[in-house]
């Protein structure tokens, strides 16, 4: 908590201090504890879009449409660096194909430990809903919005 951000290490939305890069180790500990306690899984509620992206390495949205939405954003913005993508969404500068502003709304994400949850996320029905949603959604960046908002927020050093 004593470190400050720098040009090389700028903040993500909501971040007050640079991270410690312990996310994977902490997740491993939580998974181990959940298994010891014979829990069905772990639940995450990503307050920020970038948290959902980070969690998506191991977690799935319980709602397959939300899973498809995140995959569609990643596909639409595949060429954008992670941190910049996080700020684009946070500053409301992402638009869908109809020109509506995309607004991040958190939903439950699950890390499956038991067989029933793994079966749910691996099911044809879940995967089809994810795929249909992903194919239906397209997103574009409003670069004018982004440039204005990073200036207004004093974040000019962001990419």
What are the roles of these predicted feature ranges?
Residues 1-60, 65-76:
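Acyl-donor binding region in acyl/amide transferases
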């Amino acid at each position: 908590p004593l470190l400050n951000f720098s040009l090389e290490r700028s903040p993500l939305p909501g971040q007050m201090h640079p991270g410690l890069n312990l996310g994977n180790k902490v997740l491993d500990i939580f998974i181990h504890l959940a298994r010891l306690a014979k829990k069905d899984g772990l639940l995450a509620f990503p307050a920020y879009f970038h948290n959902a992206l980070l969690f998506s390495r191991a977690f799935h949205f319980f709602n397959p449409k939300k899973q498809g939405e995140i995959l569609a954003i990643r596909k639409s913005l595949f060429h954008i660096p992670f941190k910049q993508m996080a700020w684009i969404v946070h500053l409301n500068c992402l638009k869908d194909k109809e020109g509506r502003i995309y607004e991040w709304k958190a939903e439950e994400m699950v890390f499956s430990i038991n067989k029933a949850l793994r079966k749910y996320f691996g099911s044809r029905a879940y995967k089809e809903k994810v795929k249909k949603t992903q194919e239906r959604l397209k997103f574009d960046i409003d670069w004018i919005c982004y440039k204005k908002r990073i200036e207004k927020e004093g974040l000019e050093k962001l990419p």
